[in-house]
Regions:
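Catalytic active-site module of serine/aspartate enzymes centered on a nucleophile-bearing elbow/loop
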Residues: 303-306, 311-341
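Short, surface-exposed "cap/lid" segments of acyl-processing enzymes
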Residues: 41-75
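Conserved alpha/beta-hydrolase
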Residues: 72-93
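Short beta-strand/loop motif that positions the catalytic acidic residue
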Residues: 260, 266-268
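N-terminal cap/lid segment of alpha/beta-hydrolase-fold proteins
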Residues: 11-43
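Accessory cap/linker subdomain of secreted extracellular hydrolases
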Residues: 160-259
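Alpha/beta-hydrolase active-site loop
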Residues: 100-120
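Conserved alpha/beta-hydrolase "acid-adjacent" motif
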Residues: 273-281
Length: 341
């Protein structure tokens, strides 16, 4: 169901690109704003490139100077596909805001919204491409697999900044990087015991589904860990409800990757502050075992999670003096898409 195509704030302006705003209504009554962007000179429907975004909330509209949004703008302009984005905040109180949204509902909203947007006359849904960035790398294979089950042919899936390990492993990698990459604050000899404590906390939180405050009540060590978990606030982690992360921990990302019948591109940035190489390579190895030669692995030296180049791993973790490399990322993604189309 498409409603009035009116933006409630400034419409994005990408040179050489037309951005069409519309509202899509979902089965639970939520109304989400969507943006379909394509080159100005487009005269025929284009196959869609749907985007699944990172964990943090915020609009997906183009904003000059944001590495991630510059990449999206380049894809809209140069990929030969229609870039399809869906904002996660429900409009006018019709559903949850992004900060209230849990993982399973976010996933369902993506699938429903994209499927309905494929009826747009600007879109040729004969093949669908999916791009996931950061934690969107976990929703990307799940969305692609669900769209396949609805009968849509997946032309390719691209991810950067997220691997195929379990969510528990992912968050433990966050913790290990947090300890290892701050040598001025954490002694190497203290890391093994600290990781055991953090593993206990993360298991209770993500797998057992306990509230962080309840875990903190188990004793002073757990209380100390609770106060020092990355991104964890009084009622959220990285701006999302605890339930978002606990539901993510119940999903089998690797099974989705193995099931998708499509080419796959995985980009790993060597100095990623959160993710590790193994998780990215695991996707490629799993897909290539199931469908030999269909998955591509690209490793980019000296680059961090958010597409900046740094001199050292420690500089990357501290965010010191990074140089944007989004143009390089856009070229890698666009070339790969052109090879598939």
């Amino acid at each position: 169901i498409f409603l009035s195509a009116v933006a409630v704030h400034a419409v994005e302006s990408i040179p050489g690109v037309t951005s069409h705003y519309q509202t899509v209504e979902l089965g639970d009554g939520s109304r989400l704003q969507a943006i379909v962007a394509y080159p100005d000179d487009t005269s025929a429907p284009l196959q869609p490139l749907v985007f699944t975004q990172w964990v943090s909330c915020g609009s997906l509209e183009y904003r000059e100077g944001s590495n991630a949004r510059e990449v999206l703008a380049a894809l809209a302009r140069d990929s030969g596909l229609a870039l399809v984005r869906v904002e996660r905040d429900a409009l006018d109180g019709t559903g949850p805001t992004c900060a209230e949204l849990d993982y399973d509902t976010e996933l369902e909203h993506y699938v429903q919204a994209f499927a309905r947007l494929f009826d747009d006359p600007r879109i040729d849904a004969s093949r669908v491409f999916v791009y996931g960035s950061s934690l969107g790398s976990t929703t990307a294979p799940l969305v692609a697999h669900e769209l396949e089950k609805l009968g849509f042919a997946i032309g390719g899936v691209m991810v950067q900044g997220g691997g195929g390990v379990t969510y528990l492993e992912r968050m433990l990698n966050f913790e290990r990087n947090y300890l290892e990459r701050r040598p001025e604050s954490v002694a190497a000899a203290a890391i093994p015991d600290e990781m055991l404590l953090r593993t206990r906390f993360q298991y209770e939180y993500l797998v057992a589904g306990r509230h962080p405050d309840d875990i903190a009540g188990d004793g002073p060590e757990m209380a100390r860990i609770r106060a020092d978990i990355l991104g964890m606030g009084e009622s959220d982690q990285y701006g999302r409800p605890y339930a978002w992360h606990q539901q993510a921990a119940r999903h089998n990302f690797l099974a989705a990757w193995a099931a998708i019948d499509a080419p796959v591109l995985v980009i790993f940035n060597e100095f990623d502050q959160y993710e590790i190489r193994h998780g990215h390579k695991l996707i490629v190895d799993t897909v290539n075992r199931a469908r030999p030669g269909t998955a591509t692995f690209v490793e980019r030296p000296n680059i961090g999670h958010s597409d900046n180049r740094f001199a050292t791993l420690e500089d990357a973790y501290a965010g010191r003096e990074g140089t944007p490399t989004w143009q390089e990322t856009a070229v890698i993604l666009t070339r790969w898409l052109n090879e598939q189309t």
